[in-house]
Amino acid sequence: MAHIVVMLPVYNEEARLERLLDRVRDALTGRVYRIVAVDDGSRDASAAILARRAADLPITTVTHPVNRGLAQTLLDGLRWAAEHCGNDDIVVTMDADDTHDPAYIAPLLEQIDAGADVAIASRFRPGSAVVGVPLHRRLFSYGVFALLRVFMPIHGVRDYACGYRAMRARLIREAVRRYGDRLLELRQWGFICTAELLWKLHRLGACCREVPFVLRYDYKEGVGHMPAGRTIAGYGLLVWKSWGSRRPTEPEVR
């Protein structure tokens, strides 16, 4: 049976982290799974919660002594998966602030079982909804991703940025091997990293599918949006780089 690895980027998530851990456990009852939390220099009780819950849950924590940002956190989680996961394992990435309901892990895994290499929880499918995001932000997102579908088309994909995904571990291993540190080049652009990762997995031939889901942004503590101008600039740079380098090359040997 394939192992399920749930990858959580954690940064000051004490308010909802414990609830999320319990919900992941409930969603994966009957499965062989492990939670891998990449703690990005949290200054609250997140690390203590993870250490305490490791007594009753299969939790591995990768720790950043200081905050390094979402992209570096995601990259380090992918490197962990490439090193430790078996070829048949499945890696699920999701936010640790409880905005991503673990109940959607099951339909994501169903898409993997049906032949997908990457299954995405999409905000832009019939039956999807976004709760707690103002209308103007939703319209802005629709416009940005419509442009990405024109300039960086991926068959079957409407949501390029949602980080709630299931991926085959062997695909992640190949991506880490082929791209090396260039797997996420735009690390300083924050949330752009999820679209960059998806595009590079697509360039490796990944079959991508989506399932509808409800994003509960009203559960989030604080604000996590990038300014609109920086978002546009980041996606513009991603489009430019995607056109400038259409095929991955072998990483340099050092």
Where in the sequence are the language-model features?
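Hydrophobic helical membrane-anchoring modules
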Residues: 1-4, 15, 30, 107, ...
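Short hydrophobic beta-strand elements that form part
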Residues: 5-9, 36-37, 63
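Active-site beta-to-alpha loop of glycosyltransferases that engages the nucleotide-sugar donor
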Residues: 8-22, 41
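Acidic donor-diphosphate engagement hotspot in glycosyltransferases and nucleotidyltransferases
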Residues: 20, 46, 74, 103-105, ...
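Short, acidic, metal-binding catalytic loop of nucleotide-sugar glycosyltransferases
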Residues: 22-32
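A conserved acidic beta->alpha catalytic loop
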Residues: 39-48, 66, 98
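Acceptor/aglycone-binding surface of glycosyltransferases and processive sugar-polymer synthases
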Residues: 60, 64-83, 88-90, 102-184, ...
